[in-house]
Amino acid sequence: MLIRVDPASETPIFAQVAASVRADAAAGRLRPGDRLPSARDVAASLGVNLHTVLRAYQVLRDEGLVDMRRGRGAVATDAVEPLARLHHDIEALVARARALALSPDALAALVKETYR
């Protein structure tokens, strides 16, 4: 798993780390039971404070996507599977929208309208 952040972004680093893990889960690259890289390793590779990565992992824990246990690290939970299925469904929706020559803005408007 490769976690990427943009130091120039206005989005806090911890939020970018959490979003990167979520994206891997949605893409199916993170499966239930998979271990996330250690917070220490991620912090070192990104050149950020360890507590920044721990905060990201805590956010993911609070969302139910990872389980954190002392000595085991952060492990993906079963909650990552529905996220991957949703991503697959969205890809299929986008493909159907393209076949209908629907613009991304029009599709987004339909989704927003339906979501209400």
Residue ranges and their predicted role:
Residues 48, 54-57, 72-75, 88-95, ...:
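Short, structured secondary-structure boundary patches
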